[in-house]
């Protein structure tokens, strides 16, 4: 009986070993060698004497005494499983004990007594104990990589490998043996298979009559999944393997499409750089190719500049601009005051450092941004603005006390009171002081003695008064525009007192020409301190007693210490060629204005009172033109659009039309074309049939042939009032040459650009009035009489109004007294 059971067990063990090897080889090819080494070590431990084994795998005396003896049949509910685990290395002991494979000489190391009926019921319990994902105490890969440390191995390496593995959780003693087996390391897959073989051998020994059923029940090929469910815990879902190191390319930002337009303005380069640098702080490896290149002209800043004694202003410059570039920006900011008169290279910039250092001029090659940062580290304030210097005008001033080589140059030689270019005013704020050089030679043109200023040249030796005579030899007379005798009245203005080392002292009256006629030359006398005593005092008393000239009508207030003779001598002299003091006196009553105008009554007496038609849609401009023509004492009528202008022109009697181009209903050009068409149809002016024989050909025959064909709407009622074509002047705000050509082509005689210069327009009115007078001389005579009668009537009406007003005032006074 015992020998038969032993033979059957050997056959089963041999079959199980082959089956277990095939199952283990199916897990992983890479762990086959590890399982073979574990098997050899287990055999060596099994064949070793119990006293020679390590303490962790040594069997207790009871288990060692029962080796090789058949186990008694246990009870139905008692399945004791006893495993000796050393507390020092529980994982290694479990692996070494469970991975021991049976052989002919090796006995089971665990005393397992299990009933066949309870074997099936234990499987669900073990399955339930290993269901949770947290019950697996080891990594699922550790089951194939863990191996039993041999006796001859280096224990330090084994301990290092154990320390590298996750720590095992110690279970309390109340946990069952199956739970402890489940909580063991998942690296003991081979040990679980050996335990299954031991349990099968014990069951076969208990029931020897059920061999075939046991073989089928314990066959791993038939119940492979069940055996793994019973003895192997379910591994938890393993996370995806994470590489230890990540490459920079794997986390680099993907390259998107190129940015076509920046979200920020191109001058905010500092902000763009800051944002890009802040975004790249946490980047692993971001190459420069992923970023857009930034232009240098995007960097801008503002600096303070000002003119000397003026308010400061800000200008925008680039970061890399030089001082020469900044000067261009300054001219753009100062467009009117500097840009009209100076170029950028003419300007200079001065900088005032914060320290007690001297100011300095900035060179055109210096970088503006770096200079500002160097001198003003904390930033430039408005009080530290750069000062803009402009070049001083190098116009040569006339040299004082110079000789004048031309008689008419005396007026310009003493014109020291002219307003300066800086604009201090027309009249300098100085009292009336007679100029010591105001001398006009009276006998020089007639071959008389030399003038007094020639003697002055001998004593002073100065250069001529005007620097312009160096090239021409004389100073040509340049009278004021529009005034033929303006040079005589201009010295009436107060003269600017010049302070020189040779300042003259005022003495009594001195004649400028001894022996000359006393009636023609007393006004030419002047004071001069350098004249010889014999010439300056010979006839002074006689002339001063004989001549007592009256004071001029518009003489300036004299100084209190200067006598009347000095006042008379300080008046300007008349023209040299015609010494007529009586005729020159009335001319002193008027001062030449900036724009010379005609006298108030000149048009009324010299030009016929023409009739003007004003066509303007703007009421303000219309009122201005009405006031203008009213001041000229001419007749006028107004129209607000082109259609009314044509309708009023048909009434006749107009000589001048001021036509605005931009008009409602009918514009100015269309109205002009209509007026010219009606003039041509009605044969007015040069189209008349009564013209000279030159127009007896085809030019005049056409109006004669078409005279009877004139429509009623085109026929003029008062044809006798149309003596000549009317003068049409276009008024427009456009200054384009094309608009001018278009207006002239439509039939306009002239073209005026708004705003209109009324002085120029007054002259044009006189010109156009003279043209009308030449065309119709008889009518002009009648118009003149009519104008005189109208003036007389107006004067009578004004006198009557004044008389009535005075009478009314007297009545009111008497009534109040009563």
Swiss-Prot record:
Annotated positions of the 4-aspartylphosphate modification: 660
Keyword Cytoplasm applies: yes
GO biological process, one term: phosphorelay signal transduction system
Name by which UniProt lists this protein: Response regulator SSK1
InterPro entries in alphabetical order: 2C_system_His_kinase (IPR050956), CheY-like_superfamily (IPR011006), Sig_transdc_resp-reg_receiver (IPR001789)
Domain Response regulatory: 611-769
Upper taxonomic lineage: Eukaryota, Fungi, Dikarya, Ascomycota, Pezizomycotina
Organism whose genome encodes this protein: Verticillium dahliae (strain VdLs.17 / ATCC MYA-4575 / FGSC 10137)
Protein family according to the UniProt entry: Belongs to the SSK1 family.
Pfam families: Response_reg
UniProt note: phenotype after gene disruption: Increases the sensitivity to various stresses, including oxidative stress conferred by H(2)O(2) and sodium nitroprusside dihydrate. Confers higher resistance to fungicides such as fludioxonil and iprodione. Results in significant down-regulation of melanin biosynthesis-related genes but does not affect microsclerotial development. Impairs phosphorylation of HOG1 under the treatment of sorbitol. Severely attenuates fungal virulence on tobacco seedlings.
Its job: Two-domain response regulator protein in the two-component signal transduction system of the HOG1 pathway. Modulates stress response, melanin biosynthesis and virulence via its regulation of the phosphorylation of HOG1.
Location(s) in or outside the cell: Cytoplasm
Keywords recorded for this protein, A-Z: Cytoplasm, Phosphoprotein, Two-component regulatory system, Virulence
Principal subcellular localisation of the protein: cytoplasm
């Amino acid at each position: 009986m015992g020998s038969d059971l032993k033979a059957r067990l050997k056959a089963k063990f041999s079959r199980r070993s082959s089956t277990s090897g095939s199952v283990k080889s199916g897990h992983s090819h890479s762990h086959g060698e590890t399982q073979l080494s574990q098997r050899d070590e287990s055999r060596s431990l099994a064949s070793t004497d119990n006293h020679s084994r390590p303490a962790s795998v040594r069997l207790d005396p009871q288990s060692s005494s029962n080796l090789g003896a058949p186990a008694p049949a246990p009870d139905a509910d008692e399945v004791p499983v006893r495993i000796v685990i050393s507390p020092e290395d529980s994982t290694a002991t479990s692996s070494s004990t469970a991975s021991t494979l049976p052989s002919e000489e090796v006995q089971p190391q665990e005393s397992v007594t299990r009933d066949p009926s309870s074997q099936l019921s234990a499987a669900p319990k073990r399955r339930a104990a290993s269901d949770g994902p947290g019950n697996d105490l080891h990594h699922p890969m550790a089951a194939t990589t863990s191996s039993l440390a041999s006796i001859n191995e280096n224990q330090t390496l084994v301990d290092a490998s154990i320390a590298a593995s996750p720590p095992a959780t110690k279970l309390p003693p109340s946990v069952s043996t199956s739970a402890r087996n489940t909580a063991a390391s998942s690296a003991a897959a081979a040990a679980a298979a050996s335990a299954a073989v031991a349990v099968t051998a014990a069951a076969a020994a208990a029931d020897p009559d059920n061999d075939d059923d046991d073989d089928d029940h314990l066959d791993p090929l038939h119940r492979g999944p069940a055996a793994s469910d019973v003895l192997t815990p379910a591994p938890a879902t393993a996370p995806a393997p994470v590489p230890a190191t990540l490459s920079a390319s794997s986390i680099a930002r993907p390259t998107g499409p190129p940015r076509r337009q920046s979200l920020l303005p191109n001058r905010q380069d500092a902000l763009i750089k800051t944002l890009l640098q802040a975004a790249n702080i946490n980047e692993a490896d971001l190459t420069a190719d992923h970023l857009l290149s930034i232009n240098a002209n995007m960097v801008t800043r503002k600096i303070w500049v000002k003119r000397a004694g003026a308010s400061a202003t800000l200008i925008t410059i680039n970061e890399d601009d030089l001082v020469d570039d900044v000067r261009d920006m300054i001219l753009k900011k100062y467009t009117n005051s500097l840009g009209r008169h100076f170029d950028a290279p003419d300007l200079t910039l001065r900088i005032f450092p914060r320290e007690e250092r001297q100011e300095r001029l900035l060179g055109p090659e210096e970088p503006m941004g770096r200079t500002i940062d160097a001198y003003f580290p904390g930033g430039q304030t408005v009080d530290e603005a750069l000062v803009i210097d402009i070049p001083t005008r190098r116009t040569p001033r006339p040299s004082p006390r110079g000789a004048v080589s031309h008689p008419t140059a005396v007026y310009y030689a003493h014109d020291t009171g002219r307003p300066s270019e800086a604009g201090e005013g027309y009249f300098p704020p100085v009292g009336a002081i007679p100029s010591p050089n105001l001398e006009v030679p009276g006998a020089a043109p007639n071959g008389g003695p030399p003038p007094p200023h020639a003697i002055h040249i001998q004593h002073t030796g100065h250069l001529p008064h005007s620097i312009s005579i160096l090239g021409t030899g004389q100073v040509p007379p340049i009278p004021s525009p529009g005034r033929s005798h303006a040079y005589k009245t201009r010295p009436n203005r107060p003269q600017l007192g010049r302070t020189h080392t040779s300042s003259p002292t005022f003495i009594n009256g001195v004649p400028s020409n001894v022996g000359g006629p006393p009636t023609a030359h007393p006004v030419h006398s002047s004071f001069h301190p350098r004249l010889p005593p014999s010439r300056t005092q010979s006839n002074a008393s006689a002339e001063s007693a004989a001549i007592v000239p009256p004071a001029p009508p518009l003489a300036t207030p004299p100084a209190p210490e200067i006598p009347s003779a000095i006042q008379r001598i300080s008046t300007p002299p008349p023209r040299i060629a015609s010494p007529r003091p009586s005729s020159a006196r009335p001319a002193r009553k008027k001062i030449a204005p900036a724009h010379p105008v005609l006298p108030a009554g000149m048009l009324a007496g010299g030009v016929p009172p023409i009739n003007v038609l004003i066509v303007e849609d703007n009421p303000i401009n219309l009122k201005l033109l009405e006031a203008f023509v009213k001041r000229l004492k001419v007749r006028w009528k107004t129209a607000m659009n082109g259609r009314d202008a044509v309708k009023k022109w048909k009434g006749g009697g107009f000589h001048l039309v001021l036509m605005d181009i931009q008009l409602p209903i009918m514009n100015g050009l269309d109205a002009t074309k209509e007026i010219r068409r009606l003039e041509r149809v009605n044969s007015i002016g040069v189209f008349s049939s009564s013209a000279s024989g030159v127009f007896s050909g085809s030019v005049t025959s056409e109006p004669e042939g078409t005279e009877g064909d004139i429509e009623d709407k085109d026929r003029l009622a008062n044809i006798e009032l149309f003596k000549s074509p009317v003068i049409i002047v276009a008024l427009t705000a456009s200054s384009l040459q094309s608009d001018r050509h278009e207006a002239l082509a439509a039939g306009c005689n002239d073209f005026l650009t708004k705003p209109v210069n009324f002085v120029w327009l007054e002259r044009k009115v006189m010109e156009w009035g003279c043209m009308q007078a030449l065309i119709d001389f008889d009518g002009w005579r009648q118009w003149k009489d009519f104008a005189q009668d109208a003036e007389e009537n107006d004067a009578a009406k004004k006198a009557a109004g004044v008389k009535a007003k005075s009478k009314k005032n007297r009545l009111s006074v008497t009534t109040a007294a009563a």
